Amino acid sequence: MAKEKKTNMAEGKMNETEWTKKICKILNNHLNNHLKKSKSTFHADTNVKLPYGTVIKDFDKNWNASYSEKENKFATDLVIYEEKGDRIIPRVVIEAKFKNVGTHDAITYGKKAVLHKNLMPALRYGLMIGSMEDRDLQWRLFEHGGDFDFMFCFKAEEPTEDEHKDFIALVESEIECSNNLEKMFGTKNTKSGIYCLQKDVKLH
């Protein structure tokens, strides 16, 4: 009995960074084995710094901008990316919160989402929350999380079988959305051949 109590205490000591790495490992196990394309592979990584902007120094007489060589970047908790040869395409960013999430978190992460997607319009951006016992997304996230493409709650540190299945399905659908957005934005100045665009809302 004492041994079991010690194990439970050890599980309870997991922090946000450790939990995010656990989820990243789960994703990589799936992506490496089940999600491959003929010329590309998919991977997940943590603490990746992505650009959100750069500084315009001045303009020439034709108003062509001269940019700073250094990009402004934000660290992101988890990134799922596609690797094509020597090129990397960020597909999905997932910010992480563990055991609690506040209004400030929703606003701050939402602002990051907007800035990153301004530079990478095909990027999907979401929030995952771990070890939330009631597993309900709180109202403050609906009120202040409008810039997220998705949000997902895990009841405990270790995903249940159903959570694992649902989360993987969510990530795969977001990768597909990113691919579709890339195709859509690639039709600029051409006939798109697209006759319908729908933005869906799903609640589980």
For the regions a protein language model found, what residue spans apply to each?
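C-terminal tail/extension regions appended to the core domain(s) of diverse proteins
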Residues: 1-54, 121-122, 127-204
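Phosphate/oxyanion-binding active-site loops and adjacent basic polyanion-contact surfaces
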Residues: 15-23, 70-74, 101-105
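Active-site metal-binding core of divalent-cation-utilizing nuclease and nuclease-like domains
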Residues: 42-85
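Conserved catalytic cores of phosphodiester-cleaving nucleases, focusing on short active-site segments
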Residues: 78-80, 90-98, 109
